[in-house]
Amino acid sequence: GVQRWLYFSKFLKNLGWEPIVITVKKSKASYPVFDNSLESYINNLIVHKTDTLEPLKLYSKIFYGNSKEGIQKGEVLKKNFFHHFAAFIRGNFFVPDARIGWVSYALNKGREIIKKEGIKYIVTTGPPHSSHLIGLKLKKEFSLKWIADFRDPWTSMFYLKEMYRTRFAQKRDENFEKNVLRKADKIITTIGELFHDELIQKANIS
């Protein structure tokens, strides 16, 4: 996912656009994966890095022994009561995902850039699907054109079934997803035709 939009940013620049990227500071990322071979793609890009708040770093520290290990997106450990409890916390208190703590920081930086640069178009990509909530808010505040990129399913992702979600949490997440699908000007997905049809049905669009 990172590589795809990194490449897009490079080609957009070649076409006369000036992409501006908002991301998390390297020192703040709880699940940092670095590929130094991609550095050449960002030499001429404008990148703004923000803080983030991720209380689930404590989860990583307790169960993985390392706060930088991060939250295993597709794996729920079920060794004992504490792992069951941790899965419940992840699934019900961090909706739509464990990166929800970044939203306010990204929103503040986005507002600052939009006002300063006169931005008219924005793109959000997920997962983490909480990034789409940033686009949803910025579009409402500034009447921007917004593209939402779905690299993976949202509320139908297989591992959510292992997080003991309550009906309330699931419904809240589905409402987030539906609002994004209905309010975004364009939706992009490369997952496949079945998921494409699923998104259309959820959004009640054609």
PLM feature spans:
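N-terminal subdomain of nucleotide-sugar transferases
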Residues: 1-56, 186, 192, 196
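Membrane-proximal helix-turn-helix segments that form the acceptor-binding/catalytic region
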Residues: 8, 130-133, 137-141, 154-155, ...
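Helix C-cap/helix->beta junction micro-motif
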Residues: 15, 117, 138-142
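Conserved nucleotide-sugar donor-binding subdomain of glycosyltransferases
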Residues: 65-121, 166-174
